Design a protein with these regions (language model features):
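A solvent-exposed beta-alpha-beta segment
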Residues: 1-62
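Phosphate-bearing ligand-interacting subdomains
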Residues: 37-92, 96
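Active-site phosphate/pyrophosphate- and oxyanion-stabilizing loops and adjacent acidic/basic residues
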Residues: 18, 76, 184
Length: 207
């Protein structure tokens, strides 16, 4: 198995290492600077990693998450930057992913997650304690926050952030490039890109 390089060395990268448990899986991490809290080697900037660690010999896992000023395109640009590399899928031992579920390449599934006969795209993050029910189809680069609940039959586009504790009602469709605020409840289809918050969730601003 090819060793994994984490792209990013911030707080989420620390969570990935805790979730994976076996540090021998990792070659190290790339970032603009070293983080002394990381327990794997610092390999340099993106440019240094791509020059010294060939795509054919290593796989990567993206750990960049969204900051307060949510920029959905930033993570997508980083994914494209490393397009030549194989993407490592990481699933915590304590997660429950049923046999008929499908998890895309580069996706991370964290502790206590339940995924029940759902399809999750590539380069997604399903964070601690989230529940994704039957017949959910999530696209690529989707972030599901801690303890969020996505009920059965929901369809989610690409580049979507669902905040911690949010609830998506069954059979709802959410288009691409959408942010659902923490604790919000989505009761109807979302067909316009933007930020939605509240109970029920309502459009508050463009991205």
């Amino acid at each position: 198995m090819k060793k994994i390089i984490l792209i990013g060395g911030g707080g989420h990268a620390l969570s990935v290492l805790e979730m994976a448990e076996d540090l021998s899986l990792f070659e190290g991490y790339a970032d603009l600077q070293e983080n002394v809290d990381m327990s794997i080697p610092y390999l340099g900037t993106d440019e240094e990693v791509m020059a010294n660690y060939p795509a054919g010999e290593f796989q990567i896992h993206h750990t960049l998450v969204y900051a307060k000023d949510v920029n959905l395109n930033l993570r997508q640009k980083m994914i494209q930057k490393y397009a030549a590399y194989e993407k490592a899928t990481l699933i915590a031992k304590t997660a429950c992913v049923t046999p008929h579920s499908r998890i895309g390449s580069g996706t991370g599934v964290f502790h206590g997650v339940i995924i029940n006969r759902a399809r999750i795209g590539s380069n997604c993050i399903v964070n601690t304690g989230a529940v994704i029910e039957h017949n959910v189809h999530a696209g690529d680069n989707v972030f599901v926050g801690p303890n969020a609940t996505i009920c059965g039959g929901v369809n989610i586009g690409n580049n979507v952030l669902i905040g911690a504790g949010a609830i998506i009602r069954d059979d709802v469709t959410i288009c691409s490039d959408v942010v659902i605020g923490m604790g919000s409840i989505v009761t109807h289809d979302i067909t316009q890109t933007g930020v939605y918050v509240g109970c029920p969730a309502k459009f508050v601003k463009s991205i």
